[in-house]
Amino acid sequence: VDHPEMVLGNLELESTQYGHDLTVAPIEGAVLADQLAEEMKALGVSDVRVEDKCYVYGKIPATKGYEGKTKLGFIAHMDTVSDYCDHDIIPVVHKNYDGGDLPLGTSGRTLTVKDFPHLPSLAGRTLITTDGTTVLGADDKAGVAEIMTMAEALIKENIPHGPISIAFTPDEEVGGGTDHFNVEKFGAQFAY
């Protein structure tokens, strides 16, 4: 994680869908949508807007000479699962992780190398986990963080690229994430 502060701020905001009523945009989702829009603007993303039902859109124009390249899109959903302790999320940052068993705060829960044999391959990296008392919300706030990090790199490092569209959607966890997605305004030929 290059920007744990960005991830942490977004993880701490509650963004679960209220029940299964897709006609209601949750207040917390609106807060996260507005926060992401402001972060996108600060990074230099253009045409940033929050549309009805908390859909967030933005564009990164092509660099000079790449305007005719394929229009790519990147999409992640903002809502998180609400089946298990989704309030008062306490993310824990493990800097320079040692590759061993990973205690989840003071909850008594531990991610063990025995149960997760890939853990040693992450030694030396910064990991973000829950404190063990709530879900982390990394599905798909980690995707949001990756897209924001990509946007920052493309813009600040002036990496050549074609037109890029970005979208953050609500309601994926309850099956409504694309119900009001504006494909035409999104404008990508292909999206990930």
Name every feature range the model reports, one short phrase each:
Residues 2-126:
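Acidic/His- and Gly-rich active-site-bordering loop/insert found
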